[in-house]
Regions:
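Conserved catalytic-core motifs of eukaryotic protein kinase domains, centered on the activation segment
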Residues: 107-108, 113-115, 139, 173-174
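Glycine/small-residue-rich pyrophosphate-binding loop that anchors the diphosphate of NDP-sugar donors
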Residues: 67, 87, 119-120, 131, ...
Length: 190
């Protein structure tokens, strides 16, 4: 009964956040989150989950070119995870982001006071990002990859790869954490 009530309240809370987030379907919000949307757009797919303390920022300095933060279907944003977007952050379907993760596609300031440089981040489908990982600007994380806890990702990660460390290094090829399918097994065998 208690679990059912928790899910109902999460869906109702998700409906309340529709004024700041465009949602393709029902999104569960399991507690208070921080959404800042200035000259930008935040899009969520169907059946996503957002956990307490998450911070979603889509903040463009230019009204003509708005920032776009997109999260695909069935993805999960963990407790206290922060996603900062000045240009474009794209998160695919079935992505699991653990708690305290930072996804930062820009430096918060630039040396000498010039314009802040932002570079898009792409996190492809079926990626699992471990606790307290940091994903920095200009990175693409390939389909089915796993990012280890505490990793600092500064370079692209190929599909079906485990990456960890500071800075993150590609450690080994992996099978998809989502389960097995013909495509996943063929990819992992390469």
């Amino acid at each position: 009964m208690n679990e059912t009530l928790t899910k109902i309240f999460a869906y109702v809370r998700g409906l309340w956040y529709r004024r700041k987030i465009k949602m393709a379907g029902l999104v569960k919000v399991f507690g208070r989150i921080n959404v800042r949307n200035s000259h930008g757009t935040i899009n969520f797919g169907k059946r996503c989950s957002i956990y307490p303390g998450a911070k979603l920022v889509s903040n463009s300095r230019s009204k003509e070119k708005g920032a776009v933060l997109t999260v695909g279907d069935c993805s999960s944003i963990g407790d206290r995870t922060q996603i900062q977007c000045r240009d474009r952050v794209t998160i695919g379907n079935n992505v699991l982001i653990a708690w305290d993760v930072n996804i930062l596609e820009h430096d918060f300031h630039s040396p000498g006071g010039g314009d802040v440089v932002a570079q898009p981040i792409v996190i492809e489908d079926e990626v699992w990002i471990g606790v307290r990982a940091i994903i920095l600007k200009g990175v693409t994380i390939g389909k089915g990859s796993i990012i280890g806890a505490g990793a600092v990702v500064t370079k692209d990660v190929p599909p079906y790869t485990f990456a960890g460390g500071n800075p993150a290094k590609n450690v080994k090829k992996v099978k998809s954490w989502m389960g097995s399918s013909d495509e996943t097994e063929a990819q992992a065998a390469e």
